[in-house]
Amino acid sequence: MLTGVRFLLAVAFALLCAIVYVPAQGPAKPHVVFVTGDDEYRSEITMPMIAEILERRHGFRTSVAYARPKPQTKDNIEGLEALETADLMVIYTRFRALPDPQLKRILDFSKSGKPMIGLRTTTHAFLYPEGSPHASLNDGFGRDVFGQKWITHHGHRSTTEVTIPEGQRGHAILRGVEPFHAKSWLYHVTPLHGTGNTVLLEGRSIHSDKIGKTDQFPLTQPVAWTRSYNGARVFFTTLGHPGDFESPSMRRLLINAIFWALGREVPEGGADAEPVTPYKAPETFDLSKVG
Protein backbone atom coordinates (compact mmCIF):
# COMPACT_ATOMS: atom_id res chain seq x y z
CA MET A 1 0.00 0.00 0.00
CA LEU A 2 2.84 2.35 0.95
CA THR A 3 4.51 1.63 -2.38
CA GLY A 4 1.30 2.57 -4.20
CA VAL A 5 1.02 5.85 -2.30
CA ARG A 6 4.64 6.67 -3.08
CA PHE A 7 4.01 5.92 -6.75
CA LEU A 8 0.96 8.21 -6.84
CA LEU A 9 2.90 10.99 -5.10
CA ALA A 10 5.73 10.61 -7.60
CA VAL A 11 3.30 10.84 -10.51
CA ALA A 12 1.62 13.91 -8.99
CA PHE A 13 4.99 15.57 -8.45
CA ALA A 14 6.04 14.86 -12.03
CA LEU A 15 2.81 16.34 -13.35
CA LEU A 16 3.27 19.43 -11.19
CA CYS A 17 6.79 19.89 -12.51
CA ALA A 18 5.52 19.52 -16.04
CA ILE A 19 2.99 22.27 -15.41
CA VAL A 20 5.46 24.61 -13.71
CA TYR A 21 8.42 24.12 -16.00
CA VAL A 22 6.80 24.09 -19.43
CA PRO A 23 9.05 26.43 -21.44
CA ALA A 24 7.49 29.63 -22.74
CA GLN A 25 6.49 29.64 -26.37
CA GLY A 26 8.13 33.03 -26.91
CA PRO A 27 7.14 36.55 -25.88
CA ALA A 28 3.60 37.75 -26.34
CA LYS A 29 2.93 39.51 -29.63
CA PRO A 30 3.77 43.19 -29.30
CA HIS A 31 0.69 45.35 -29.79
CA VAL A 32 1.40 48.37 -32.01
CA VAL A 33 -1.34 50.98 -32.40
CA PHE A 34 -1.29 53.35 -35.37
CA VAL A 35 -3.08 56.66 -34.83
CA THR A 36 -3.89 58.12 -38.25
CA GLY A 37 -5.38 61.46 -39.15
CA ASP A 38 -3.46 63.23 -41.90
CA ASP A 39 -5.47 63.46 -45.08
CA GLU A 40 -2.74 65.56 -46.75
CA TYR A 41 -0.23 62.70 -46.80
CA ARG A 42 -2.78 59.88 -46.58
CA SER A 43 -1.69 58.25 -43.36
CA GLU A 44 -4.98 56.33 -43.43
CA ILE A 45 -3.47 54.38 -46.35
CA THR A 46 0.26 54.25 -45.59
CA MET A 47 0.05 53.23 -41.93
CA PRO A 48 -2.26 50.22 -42.51
CA MET A 49 0.23 49.05 -45.12
CA ILE A 50 2.99 49.11 -42.49
CA ALA A 51 0.67 47.45 -39.97
CA GLU A 52 0.00 44.61 -42.40
CA ILE A 53 3.74 44.02 -42.83
CA LEU A 54 4.18 43.87 -39.05
CA GLU A 55 1.36 41.36 -38.66
CA ARG A 56 2.01 39.07 -41.61
CA ARG A 57 5.80 39.15 -41.76
CA HIS A 58 6.76 39.68 -38.13
CA GLY A 59 3.92 38.26 -36.04
CA PHE A 60 2.97 41.51 -34.32
CA ARG A 61 -0.54 42.48 -33.30
CA THR A 62 -1.68 45.83 -34.65
CA SER A 63 -4.62 48.20 -34.44
CA VAL A 64 -5.31 51.26 -36.57
CA ALA A 65 -7.34 54.25 -35.39
CA TYR A 66 -8.97 56.32 -38.15
CA ALA A 67 -10.53 59.75 -38.53
CA ARG A 68 -14.27 59.23 -39.08
CA PRO A 69 -16.51 59.56 -40.99
CA LYS A 70 -13.82 60.68 -43.48
CA PRO A 71 -10.07 61.35 -43.33
CA GLN A 72 -10.63 65.11 -43.41
CA THR A 73 -12.65 64.99 -40.18
CA LYS A 74 -10.59 66.93 -37.65
CA ASP A 75 -12.55 66.26 -34.46
CA ASN A 76 -12.97 62.49 -34.33
CA ILE A 77 -10.54 59.58 -34.40
CA GLU A 78 -12.16 56.22 -33.73
CA GLY A 79 -10.33 53.25 -32.26
CA LEU A 80 -8.14 55.07 -29.72
CA GLU A 81 -9.29 52.70 -26.97
CA ALA A 82 -6.72 50.28 -28.43
CA LEU A 83 -4.03 52.43 -26.78
CA GLU A 84 -5.06 50.95 -23.43
CA THR A 85 -3.29 47.69 -24.36
CA ALA A 86 -0.67 49.09 -26.73
CA ASP A 87 3.03 48.41 -26.30
CA LEU A 88 3.90 51.18 -28.76
CA MET A 89 2.07 54.08 -30.41
CA VAL A 90 2.79 55.22 -33.96
CA ILE A 91 1.13 58.59 -34.52
CA TYR A 92 0.73 60.39 -37.85
CA THR A 93 -1.81 63.17 -37.49
CA ARG A 94 -2.15 66.78 -38.60
CA PHE A 95 -4.14 69.71 -37.19
CA ARG A 96 -6.61 67.67 -35.12
CA ALA A 97 -8.93 69.13 -32.48
CA LEU A 98 -10.12 66.01 -30.71
CA PRO A 99 -12.73 65.88 -27.95
CA ASP A 100 -11.35 65.55 -24.44
CA PRO A 101 -11.87 61.78 -24.01
CA GLN A 102 -10.01 61.01 -27.26
CA LEU A 103 -7.23 63.50 -26.56
CA LYS A 104 -6.80 62.04 -23.09
CA ARG A 105 -6.08 58.59 -24.52
CA ILE A 106 -3.22 59.97 -26.62
CA LEU A 107 -1.81 62.14 -23.84
CA ASP A 108 -2.08 59.35 -21.28
CA PHE A 109 -0.09 57.06 -23.55
CA SER A 110 2.53 59.76 -24.16
CA LYS A 111 3.04 60.03 -20.39
CA SER A 112 3.08 56.28 -19.79
CA GLY A 113 6.77 55.68 -20.39
CA LYS A 114 5.99 53.40 -23.33
CA PRO A 115 7.76 53.91 -26.68
CA MET A 116 6.42 56.17 -29.40
CA ILE A 117 7.04 56.88 -33.06
CA GLY A 118 5.90 59.98 -34.92
CA LEU A 119 5.89 60.95 -38.57
CA ARG A 120 6.08 64.23 -40.44
CA THR A 121 3.03 66.37 -39.60
CA THR A 122 2.95 65.09 -36.05
CA THR A 123 5.12 68.14 -35.37
CA HIS A 124 1.72 69.84 -35.63
CA ALA A 125 -0.53 66.97 -34.62
CA PHE A 126 -3.13 69.26 -33.04
CA LEU A 127 -4.77 72.59 -33.84
CA TYR A 128 -6.99 73.86 -31.06
CA PRO A 129 -8.45 77.37 -31.25
CA GLU A 130 -7.00 80.25 -29.27
CA GLY A 131 -8.46 80.21 -25.80
CA SER A 132 -8.84 76.43 -25.72
CA PRO A 133 -7.30 74.77 -22.65
CA HIS A 134 -5.48 72.54 -25.14
CA ALA A 135 -4.05 75.30 -27.37
CA SER A 136 -0.57 74.80 -25.91
CA LEU A 137 -0.50 71.37 -27.55
CA ASN A 138 -0.48 72.97 -31.01
CA ASP A 139 3.26 73.56 -30.62
CA GLY A 140 3.97 71.74 -27.39
CA PHE A 141 3.08 68.16 -28.28
CA GLY A 142 5.38 67.88 -31.28
CA ARG A 143 8.13 69.91 -29.64
CA ASP A 144 8.17 68.23 -26.25
CA VAL A 145 7.44 64.64 -27.22
CA PHE A 146 9.17 64.35 -30.59
CA GLY A 147 11.70 67.16 -30.63
CA GLN A 148 10.23 69.93 -32.77
CA LYS A 149 7.11 71.92 -33.58
CA TRP A 150 6.00 73.01 -37.05
CA ILE A 151 8.24 75.79 -38.42
CA THR A 152 8.31 75.72 -42.24
CA HIS A 153 9.28 73.57 -45.23
CA HIS A 154 11.19 74.07 -48.46
CA GLY A 155 8.21 74.19 -50.81
CA HIS A 156 5.73 71.80 -52.40
CA ARG A 157 7.75 71.61 -55.62
CA SER A 158 10.89 70.44 -53.86
CA THR A 159 12.07 66.92 -53.03
CA THR A 160 14.73 65.59 -50.67
CA GLU A 161 17.91 63.57 -51.00
CA VAL A 162 18.20 61.43 -47.87
CA THR A 163 21.67 60.47 -46.61
CA ILE A 164 23.24 58.82 -43.58
CA PRO A 165 25.50 61.08 -41.50
CA GLU A 166 29.04 59.92 -40.89
CA GLY A 167 29.24 57.73 -37.83
CA GLN A 168 25.63 56.58 -37.82
CA ARG A 169 25.79 53.70 -40.30
CA GLY A 170 26.11 51.20 -37.46
CA HIS A 171 22.88 52.17 -35.71
CA ALA A 172 20.39 49.30 -35.53
CA ILE A 173 17.58 51.38 -37.04
CA LEU A 174 19.67 51.87 -40.18
CA ARG A 175 20.28 48.18 -40.89
CA GLY A 176 19.40 47.63 -44.52
CA VAL A 177 18.59 51.32 -45.03
CA GLU A 178 20.35 53.00 -47.95
CA PRO A 179 20.36 56.65 -49.05
CA PHE A 180 17.27 57.38 -51.15
CA HIS A 181 15.36 60.13 -52.91
CA ALA A 182 12.25 61.18 -51.00
CA LYS A 183 9.22 62.93 -52.42
CA SER A 184 8.74 64.67 -49.08
CA TRP A 185 9.68 68.34 -49.18
CA LEU A 186 12.21 69.08 -46.48
CA TYR A 187 11.01 70.34 -43.08
CA HIS A 188 13.09 72.91 -41.23
CA VAL A 189 13.62 71.54 -37.72
CA THR A 190 16.92 72.87 -36.35
CA PRO A 191 17.76 73.34 -33.62
CA LEU A 192 16.02 70.27 -32.27
CA HIS A 193 14.35 70.81 -28.91
CA GLY A 194 15.87 69.42 -25.75
CA THR A 195 18.84 67.15 -25.25
CA GLY A 196 19.61 63.57 -26.18
CA ASN A 197 18.55 63.82 -29.83
CA THR A 198 20.54 61.47 -32.07
CA VAL A 199 20.25 62.35 -35.76
CA LEU A 200 20.16 59.20 -37.91
CA LEU A 201 19.32 60.63 -41.34
CA GLU A 202 19.77 63.99 -43.01
CA GLY A 203 18.01 65.41 -46.02
CA ARG A 204 19.11 67.98 -48.58
CA SER A 205 16.39 69.94 -50.35
CA ILE A 206 16.29 69.78 -54.14
CA HIS A 207 14.63 72.78 -55.86
CA SER A 208 14.04 74.53 -52.53
CA ASP A 209 11.96 77.69 -52.43
CA LYS A 210 14.25 78.96 -49.66
CA ILE A 211 17.11 79.83 -52.01
CA GLY A 212 18.27 83.26 -50.90
CA LYS A 213 17.26 82.49 -47.31
CA THR A 214 19.58 79.57 -46.64
CA ASP A 215 21.32 81.41 -43.82
CA GLN A 216 18.01 81.14 -41.97
CA PHE A 217 16.74 77.92 -43.55
CA PRO A 218 19.70 75.69 -44.51
CA LEU A 219 19.21 73.24 -47.36
CA THR A 220 20.31 70.32 -45.16
CA GLN A 221 18.26 69.27 -42.13
CA PRO A 222 17.78 66.21 -39.92
CA VAL A 223 14.97 64.01 -41.25
CA ALA A 224 15.10 61.17 -38.69
CA TRP A 225 16.26 61.04 -35.10
CA THR A 226 15.87 59.25 -31.78
CA ARG A 227 15.33 60.73 -28.34
CA SER A 228 13.64 59.85 -25.07
CA TYR A 229 10.50 61.14 -23.40
CA ASN A 230 9.46 60.20 -19.88
CA GLY A 231 12.04 57.44 -20.06
CA ALA A 232 10.57 55.99 -23.25
CA ARG A 233 12.37 55.39 -26.51
CA VAL A 234 11.14 57.78 -29.18
CA PHE A 235 11.78 57.87 -32.93
CA PHE A 236 10.68 60.63 -35.27
CA THR A 237 10.95 61.25 -38.99
CA THR A 238 9.86 64.27 -40.98
CA LEU A 239 9.52 62.01 -44.01
CA GLY A 240 6.14 60.49 -44.79
CA HIS A 241 4.91 61.52 -48.25
CA PRO A 242 3.01 58.49 -49.61
CA GLY A 243 5.54 58.28 -52.43
CA ASP A 244 8.33 57.78 -49.88
CA PHE A 245 6.84 54.42 -48.91
CA GLU A 246 7.51 53.05 -52.38
CA SER A 247 11.16 52.97 -51.27
CA PRO A 248 12.20 49.79 -49.42
CA SER A 249 14.55 51.94 -47.34
CA MET A 250 11.70 54.12 -46.10
CA ARG A 251 9.55 51.15 -45.16
CA ARG A 252 12.49 49.40 -43.51
CA LEU A 253 13.44 52.56 -41.61
CA LEU A 254 10.03 52.68 -39.97
CA ILE A 255 9.81 48.95 -39.24
CA ASN A 256 13.37 48.86 -37.87
CA ALA A 257 12.47 51.83 -35.67
CA ILE A 258 9.47 49.93 -34.30
CA PHE A 259 11.72 46.97 -33.43
CA TRP A 260 14.26 49.30 -31.81
CA ALA A 261 11.68 51.28 -29.83
CA LEU A 262 10.25 48.05 -28.42
CA GLY A 263 13.72 46.89 -27.39
CA ARG A 264 13.68 44.02 -29.86
CA GLU A 265 16.70 43.01 -31.89
CA VAL A 266 16.64 44.48 -35.39
CA PRO A 267 17.47 41.66 -37.84
CA GLU A 268 20.86 41.77 -39.52
CA GLY A 269 20.33 43.39 -42.88
CA GLY A 270 17.18 45.05 -41.57
CA ALA A 271 13.62 43.91 -41.05
CA ASP A 272 11.58 42.42 -43.88
CA ALA A 273 9.73 45.42 -45.31
CA GLU A 274 8.11 43.91 -48.38
CA PRO A 275 4.45 44.94 -48.64
CA VAL A 276 1.99 42.10 -48.19
CA THR A 277 -0.39 43.76 -50.65
CA PRO A 278 1.22 45.55 -53.62
CA TYR A 279 1.60 49.22 -52.71
CA LYS A 280 1.12 52.12 -55.09
CA ALA A 281 1.39 55.58 -53.63
CA PRO A 282 -1.92 57.46 -53.57
CA GLU A 283 -2.18 61.09 -54.54
CA THR A 284 -1.57 63.60 -51.77
CA PHE A 285 -3.83 66.53 -52.51
CA ASP A 286 -6.77 65.19 -54.53
CA LEU A 287 -8.94 64.93 -51.44
CA SER A 288 -12.03 64.18 -53.52
CA LYS A 289 -10.59 60.69 -53.90
CA VAL A 290 -10.29 60.16 -50.16
CA GLY A 291 -12.88 57.65 -48.98
Where are these regions (language model features)?
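Helical hinge/lid and interdomain linker segments adjacent to catalytic or ligand-binding clefts
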Residues: K29-V35, D39-A125
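A glycine-rich, often tryptophan-bearing local segment used as a flexible ligand/cofactor-contacting loop or short
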Residues: I91, R96-G176
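N-terminal secretory signal peptides that target proteins for export/translocation
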Residues: M1-V5
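Extracellular ligand-binding/catalytic regions of CAZymes and related secreted enzymes
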Residues: G26-P30, I45-T46, R56, H207-G291
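Active-site rim elements
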Residues: G37-E40, R157-V162, G240-P248
